[in-house]
Protein backbone atom coordinates (compact mmCIF):
# COMPACT_ATOMS: atom_id res chain seq x y z
CA UNK A 1 0.00 0.00 0.00
CA UNK A 2 0.96 3.66 -0.12
CA UNK A 3 2.26 3.35 3.46
CA UNK A 4 5.17 1.32 2.08
CA UNK A 5 6.55 4.59 0.69
CA UNK A 6 6.96 5.92 4.24
CA UNK A 7 9.78 3.59 5.28
CA UNK A 8 13.16 5.20 6.11
CA UNK A 9 14.72 3.74 2.96
CA UNK A 10 12.08 5.54 0.92
CA UNK A 11 12.81 9.05 2.14
CA UNK A 12 12.46 11.40 -0.79
CA UNK A 13 15.70 12.94 -1.95
CA UNK A 14 15.80 16.60 -2.94
CA UNK A 15 14.49 17.04 -6.45
CA UNK A 16 16.73 18.68 -9.02
CA UNK A 17 15.28 22.08 -9.86
CA UNK A 18 16.07 21.94 -13.57
CA UNK A 19 14.01 18.77 -14.11
CA UNK A 20 10.77 20.73 -13.81
CA UNK A 21 9.72 23.24 -16.44
CA UNK A 22 7.99 26.25 -14.93
CA UNK A 23 5.66 28.69 -16.70
CA UNK A 24 5.04 32.13 -15.24
CA UNK A 25 2.06 34.05 -16.64
CA UNK A 26 2.24 37.79 -16.00
CA UNK A 27 1.43 40.78 -18.19
CA UNK A 28 4.13 42.80 -16.42
CA UNK A 29 7.86 42.27 -15.98
CA UNK A 30 8.69 39.52 -13.51
CA UNK A 31 11.39 41.00 -11.31
CA UNK A 32 13.23 37.84 -10.27
CA UNK A 33 13.12 35.92 -13.56
CA UNK A 34 16.87 35.93 -14.22
CA UNK A 35 17.75 35.41 -10.56
CA UNK A 36 15.54 32.32 -10.39
CA UNK A 37 17.14 30.96 -13.55
CA UNK A 38 20.57 31.49 -12.01
CA UNK A 39 19.33 29.55 -8.99
CA UNK A 40 18.71 26.54 -11.23
CA UNK A 41 15.03 26.83 -12.12
CA UNK A 42 13.92 26.18 -15.70
CA UNK A 43 11.49 29.08 -16.14
CA UNK A 44 9.77 30.68 -19.12
CA UNK A 45 7.58 33.76 -18.83
CA UNK A 46 4.41 34.38 -20.84
CA UNK A 47 2.57 37.70 -21.00
CA UNK A 48 -0.75 35.86 -21.22
CA UNK A 49 -2.39 32.59 -22.20
CA UNK A 50 -3.71 32.23 -25.73
CA UNK A 51 -5.09 28.78 -24.92
CA UNK A 52 -4.65 26.04 -22.32
CA UNK A 53 -2.67 23.67 -24.53
CA UNK A 54 0.35 25.98 -24.65
CA UNK A 55 1.12 24.93 -21.05
CA UNK A 56 0.87 21.20 -21.69
CA UNK A 57 4.60 20.61 -21.13
CA UNK A 58 4.89 22.60 -17.89
CA UNK A 59 4.41 20.64 -14.64
CA UNK A 60 4.45 23.89 -12.65
CA UNK A 61 2.40 26.97 -13.52
CA UNK A 62 2.61 30.27 -11.62
CA UNK A 63 0.06 32.88 -12.60
CA UNK A 64 -0.70 36.48 -11.70
CA UNK A 65 -4.31 36.96 -10.67
CA UNK A 66 -4.77 40.27 -12.47
CA UNK A 67 -4.08 41.31 -16.05
CA UNK A 68 -4.01 37.83 -17.62
CA UNK A 69 -6.56 35.47 -19.12
CA UNK A 70 -7.90 38.25 -21.34
CA UNK A 71 -8.79 35.92 -24.23
CA UNK A 72 -11.06 33.93 -21.92
CA UNK A 73 -13.09 37.08 -21.18
CA UNK A 74 -13.77 36.18 -17.55
CA UNK A 75 -13.92 38.95 -14.94
CA UNK A 76 -11.93 36.59 -12.68
CA UNK A 77 -8.88 36.89 -14.94
CA UNK A 78 -5.95 34.79 -13.76
CA UNK A 79 -8.06 32.94 -11.19
CA UNK A 80 -10.35 31.70 -13.95
CA UNK A 81 -7.34 30.72 -16.06
CA UNK A 82 -5.88 28.69 -13.19
CA UNK A 83 -9.20 26.94 -12.59
CA UNK A 84 -9.49 25.95 -16.24
CA UNK A 85 -5.90 24.72 -16.33
CA UNK A 86 -6.53 22.65 -13.20
CA UNK A 87 -9.52 21.01 -14.84
CA UNK A 88 -7.43 20.00 -17.84
CA UNK A 89 -4.19 19.22 -15.97
CA UNK A 90 -5.11 18.21 -12.40
CA UNK A 91 -1.68 16.84 -11.44
CA UNK A 92 0.29 19.97 -12.23
CA UNK A 93 1.33 22.29 -9.40
CA UNK A 94 -0.24 25.75 -9.41
CA UNK A 95 0.50 29.00 -7.63
CA UNK A 96 -1.26 32.35 -7.89
CA UNK A 97 0.54 35.52 -6.95
CA UNK A 98 -0.90 38.92 -6.26
CA UNK A 99 -0.60 42.08 -4.20
CA UNK A 100 -1.27 42.35 -0.49
CA UNK A 101 -5.03 41.99 -0.90
CA UNK A 102 -7.36 40.30 -3.36
CA UNK A 103 -11.08 39.76 -3.75
CA UNK A 104 -12.06 36.80 -1.55
CA UNK A 105 -14.75 35.91 -4.09
CA UNK A 106 -12.03 34.22 -6.15
CA UNK A 107 -11.22 31.73 -3.38
CA UNK A 108 -13.44 29.11 -4.98
CA UNK A 109 -11.30 29.37 -8.11
CA UNK A 110 -8.09 28.76 -6.19
CA UNK A 111 -8.83 25.62 -4.20
CA UNK A 112 -5.61 23.67 -3.75
CA UNK A 113 -3.55 26.51 -5.25
CA UNK A 114 -0.59 28.07 -3.44
CA UNK A 115 -0.92 31.82 -2.89
CA UNK A 116 2.27 33.86 -3.21
CA UNK A 117 2.56 37.54 -2.29
CA UNK A 118 4.14 39.73 -4.96
CA UNK A 119 6.39 41.59 -2.56
CA UNK A 120 8.41 38.59 -1.30
CA UNK A 121 12.17 38.46 -1.86
CA UNK A 122 14.17 36.03 -4.00
CA UNK A 123 14.89 33.74 -1.01
CA UNK A 124 11.17 33.26 -0.42
CA UNK A 125 10.51 32.71 -4.12
CA UNK A 126 13.04 29.87 -4.10
CA UNK A 127 11.31 28.32 -1.08
CA UNK A 128 7.87 28.63 -2.68
CA UNK A 129 8.96 27.04 -5.95
CA UNK A 130 10.88 24.27 -4.17
CA UNK A 131 7.64 23.49 -2.32
CA UNK A 132 5.76 23.28 -5.63
CA UNK A 133 8.39 20.88 -6.97
CA UNK A 134 8.10 18.75 -3.85
CA UNK A 135 4.32 18.71 -4.22
CA UNK A 136 4.40 17.14 -7.68
CA UNK A 137 7.46 14.91 -7.33
CA UNK A 138 6.63 13.10 -4.09
CA UNK A 139 5.12 9.73 -5.17
CA UNK A 140 2.83 9.58 -2.14
CA UNK A 141 1.41 13.07 -2.73
CA UNK A 142 0.87 12.29 -6.41
CA UNK A 143 -1.04 9.10 -5.60
CA UNK A 144 -3.29 10.90 -3.12
CA UNK A 145 -4.23 13.37 -5.87
CA UNK A 146 -4.90 10.54 -8.31
CA UNK A 147 -6.98 8.74 -5.69
CA UNK A 148 -9.13 11.83 -5.04
CA UNK A 149 -9.78 12.22 -8.76
CA UNK A 150 -10.74 8.56 -9.15
CA UNK A 151 -13.05 8.73 -6.14
CA UNK A 152 -14.86 11.61 -7.84
CA UNK A 153 -15.15 9.34 -10.90
CA UNK A 154 -16.86 6.83 -8.57
CA UNK A 155 -14.21 4.14 -8.97
CA UNK A 156 -14.96 1.36 -6.48
CA UNK A 157 -12.68 0.91 -3.47
CA UNK A 158 -11.47 -2.56 -4.49
CA UNK A 159 -10.29 -1.25 -7.86
CA UNK A 160 -8.66 1.71 -6.10
CA UNK A 161 -6.81 -0.60 -3.72
CA UNK A 162 -5.56 -2.72 -6.63
CA UNK A 163 -4.40 0.36 -8.52
CA UNK A 164 -2.66 1.65 -5.40
CA UNK A 165 -0.75 -1.61 -4.96
CA UNK A 166 0.34 -1.56 -8.58
CA UNK A 167 1.34 2.11 -8.34
CA UNK A 168 3.50 1.41 -5.27
CA UNK A 169 5.09 -1.61 -6.97
CA UNK A 170 6.06 0.59 -9.91
CA UNK A 171 7.66 3.12 -7.56
CA UNK A 172 9.53 0.54 -5.49
CA UNK A 173 10.53 -2.00 -8.12
CA UNK A 174 10.20 -0.49 -11.60
CA UNK A 175 11.88 2.91 -11.22
CA UNK A 176 8.65 4.82 -11.72
CA UNK A 177 7.97 3.48 -15.22
CA UNK A 178 4.22 3.95 -15.79
CA UNK A 179 4.10 2.95 -19.46
CA UNK A 180 2.05 -0.17 -18.64
CA UNK A 181 -0.09 1.32 -15.88
CA UNK A 182 -2.71 0.12 -15.31
CA UNK A 183 -1.57 -3.37 -16.32
CA UNK A 184 -3.57 -5.43 -18.81
CA UNK A 185 -5.01 -7.46 -15.93
CA UNK A 186 -6.23 -4.32 -14.15
CA UNK A 187 -7.48 -2.75 -17.37
CA UNK A 188 -9.99 -5.55 -17.84
CA UNK A 189 -11.62 -4.70 -14.51
CA UNK A 190 -11.88 -0.96 -15.18
CA UNK A 191 -14.51 0.97 -17.05
CA UNK A 192 -12.90 2.17 -20.32
CA UNK A 193 -13.59 5.80 -19.40
CA UNK A 194 -11.90 5.34 -16.03
CA UNK A 195 -8.95 3.56 -17.65
CA UNK A 196 -8.53 6.55 -19.96
CA UNK A 197 -8.60 8.89 -16.95
CA UNK A 198 -5.88 6.87 -15.18
CA UNK A 199 -3.65 6.77 -18.26
CA UNK A 200 -4.03 10.50 -18.86
CA UNK A 201 -3.17 11.26 -15.23
CA UNK A 202 0.08 9.29 -15.16
CA UNK A 203 1.19 10.34 -18.64
CA UNK A 204 2.85 13.57 -17.57
CA UNK A 205 4.01 12.97 -14.00
CA UNK A 206 7.66 13.41 -13.02
CA UNK A 207 8.32 11.49 -9.83
CA UNK A 208 11.38 11.78 -7.65
CA UNK A 209 12.20 8.08 -7.25
CA UNK A 210 15.32 6.42 -5.96
Regions from the PLM with identified roles:
Residues 144-210:
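C-terminal output/effector regions of signal-responsive regulators
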Residues 80-108, 115:
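A short, hydrophobic beta-strand element within the central beta-sheet of small alpha/beta folds
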Residues 12-29, 36:
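Conserved acidic segment of CheY-like receiver
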Residues 24-27, 46, 61, 85:
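Conserved sequence signature across two-component system core domains
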Residues 28-32, 49, 65-73, 100-104, ...:
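Short acidic, S/G/P-rich loop/turn micro-motifs used as interaction or catalytic elements
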Residues 58-89:
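Conserved phosphotransfer microenvironments
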Residues 121-156:
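Receiver (REC) domain switch/output surface
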Residues 36-57:
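A short, well-structured beta->alpha microelement
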Amino acid sequence: TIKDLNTPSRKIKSASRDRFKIAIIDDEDFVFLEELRKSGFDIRKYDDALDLQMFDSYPIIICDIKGVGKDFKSPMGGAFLIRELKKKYPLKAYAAYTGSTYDISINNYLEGVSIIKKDIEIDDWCIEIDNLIRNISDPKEVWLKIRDILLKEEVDLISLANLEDEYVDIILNKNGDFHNFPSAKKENTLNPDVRAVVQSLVAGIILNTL
